[in-house]
């Protein structure tokens, strides 16, 4: 959901594009009519109010994972007026936040390969890779690996705790002595 944490009424809109990979540089394409719907189109919230947008996937029920870039934009309803040295200036501050919406495959197939310091996702849905620095119990490195992608581990020759997390499964890749 969104929360208006300003002192003024704000308008919130949402826009949605399909992306080929769930990353910042993912190539955007228009969504086929009716594949993903959301409600409402926009919200107007007073100071301190919160509300949510709902997303509905009505596209194909197949074995392909899909990614959508969701952009939430906050726009003030009135421009701020600043008077300085006898001049009136109006300004707007528009804030946007982006997130990735993931639609998992209808039938999920989890599979991976780990060899020579490379973790590969050979299934059809994403999983999370986590690792520690050395043999610490603090897992300070984490990456989501989408289907067909691979991750080359920078310090593969060094001892570390490395694992894959998928659903409620934890799969150790390397352990510490």
What do these predicted ranges mean?
Residues 27-61, 135-161:
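Intrinsically disordered, low-complexity Pro/Gly/Ser/Thr-rich segments with frequent PxxP/GP/PP motifs
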Residues 6-31, 73, 124-139:
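Short acidic, flexible loop segments centered on an aromatic residue
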Residues 1-6, 57, 117-125, 131:
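Asparagine-centered strand-capping/turn motif at beta-strand->loop junctions
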Residues 58-108, 159-177:
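Terminal connector regions
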């Amino acid at each position: 959901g969104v929360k208006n944490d300003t002192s003024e009424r704000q308008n919130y809109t949402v826009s949605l594009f399909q992306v080929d990979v769930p990353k910042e540089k993912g190539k955007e394409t228009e969504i086929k009519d009716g594949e993903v719907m959301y409600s409402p189109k926009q919200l107007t919230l007073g100071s301190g109010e919160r509300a949510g947008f709902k997303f509905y996937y009505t596209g194909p029920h197949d074995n392909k994972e899909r990614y959508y870039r969701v952009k939430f934009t906050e726009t003030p309803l009135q421009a701020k007026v600043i008077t300085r040295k006898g001049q009136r200036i109006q300004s707007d501050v528009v804030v946007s936040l982006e997130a990735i919406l993931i639609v998992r495959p209808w039938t999920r197939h989890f599979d991976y390969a780990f060899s020579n310091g490379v973790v590969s996702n050979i299934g059809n849905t994403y999983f999370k890779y986590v690792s520690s620095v050395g043999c610490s119990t603090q897992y300070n490195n984490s990456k989501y690996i989408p289907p067909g992608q691979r991750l080359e581990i920078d310090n593969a020759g060094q001892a570390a705790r490395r694992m894959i997390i998928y659903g409620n499964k934890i799969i150790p890749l390397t352990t510490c002595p």
